[in-house]
Amino acid sequence: MLKSLFCIAIAGLLVSTSAAAPASAAPAPIDWAACGEIGGECATIKVPVDYADPSGPTLDLAIGRLKASEPDKRIGVLIVHPGGPGGSGISPFILNGAIAPDSAMRKYFDLVSLDPRGVGRSTPVRCSADVVNESPLTFPANEAEYQAWLAYNAKLSEDCREHTGATIDHVHTTNAARDIDSIRAVLGERQISFFALSYGTQVGQQYAELFPGRLRAMAIDSNMDHSITSVFRYLQTTTEDLEGSFKAFVRWCDSTRACALNGEDVTGVWDGLHDRAAAGRLDDPATGEPITAEQLRLTLFDAMYDPAGSWFDLASHLKTLADGEATARTTAKTGKTSKTGTTGPRKRQETVGYAYPSIWCSDWKWEVSGFEQLDQYRKRLERLYPHTKLSPFWSDVLVCLNWQGKVSNPQHRLDITGNPPTLLPKARYDVGTPAAWNYGAARQIPRTTVLEYDGVGHGQYRNSTCARTHIETYLTSLVLPPRGTRCAAEYPDRPSATAKAERGPLSPTGRPLH
């Protein structure tokens, strides 16, 4: 079975010290060392902390590769970028073989990935575990809770800066894109091919802005749209695809006899559970702990990343909640231990790797006048989307309010010229990167072909055999699918004994990532 392309490794590893390097120095030879059990090689290279000061301090950037398994047919280097922000590329792609050995990517390319700056093995952003664990967990219900978010964000940002140092000011996506070109240069390649999904697509988009001529090919799967400046538009698009995904799940269950809720009013079951959770009257039969409406929505949201691995379990879980019986699947938890049934870290640590807010809040500037405006947005969304109410990605906005750091890479429309033809696969409904974001990105990237997957899910290389074929054909031969090509939805008709549900990536606070 194809493993997930957005496996996330969040835990921070080794923090390295900065050193200076002359701007004009030729790239030092890479000191590759064997890593993992599938033939990977790993190394660390030095890149500027601040590309505006190329002769200044450097940071360690961890990279890894799997050499082409058919070297006589090698095309070149394919850089595969993880999602997040905060996701490791080395752990899934180099150490754990998230891209199958028989794929064209593995056969004909040296597959190269990285832990992006500030993440994992690459001079990670670190924060006090105790402060991270103090995070508010819910959308603010009143002015006091809104002010608590503002105070917490200021406290966390100052704490992360204290434990990380000046690097924290330079983890924005523009620098992440420049890091890709540093990797290209140190590998001695004139051009690279690039594949990414989710947040990694923004890195690819900005790389195409900066270095369009250094791209041989670019396939960006499930796209961010970094031109969105409206808070309401951001929340609306994410909730729209959650509502659409839920309705697709209902239709699937109605037509799939093996679904645990087949023959029942699936929408009614969900709405009833949500009403009970919102009223504080829904308990987890397995633990006796209360389940909040936010936790219930996060469980639904999480299952929409991977229908093949999750929908049967989701239906069974909802049925057992409705019947008051224990279930093997757990309702999503959101952070620290509390009376709301959330769970904390398994063992105490002084600091943890937590790159997401430092990267995200360097990229996104949100204008919010105060609690009343946010509350009005929530009420509008609940009227527009009566079943799912509000996407859990409200946290993408809340975490940046009063963050004590510069927005170095604010939202903007892409300005790209001279890029190669680009393939942009997208789903009909995608809770991680909504359809509207993909269309928005496609309009900003010249020579883009949109590949439509008519199903639900995040990461179409995994979710659709049709999309996977087109992606690999394009990357190897540069042949794009005809414009207007659509891939049919692929949903399971019976539970699989071997399928493993791939959950959406979470931050250390339990909030979802891209």
Predicted regions: what they are:
Residues 304-308, 429-432:
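Acidic catalytic loop of the alpha/beta-hydrolase fold
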Residues 312-314, 373-374:
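Solenoid-repeat scaffolds in large eukaryotic assemblies
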Residues 1-25, 45, 180:
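Secretory targeting and sorting signals
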Residues 256, 307-310, 320-331, 464:
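Short, solvent-exposed helix-helix connector turns and helix-capping sites enriched
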Residues 26-295, 358-360, 364-514:
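Gly/Pro-rich cap/lid or specificity-loop segments adjacent to the active site
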Residues 166, 224-243, 315-319, 326-335, ...:
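Flexible "cap/lid" loop of the alpha/beta hydrolase fold
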Residues 282-299, 305-309, 343-354:
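Structural motif
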Residues 274, 297-304, 315-322:
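Short, amphipathic alpha-helical segments that act as regulatory/interfacial helices
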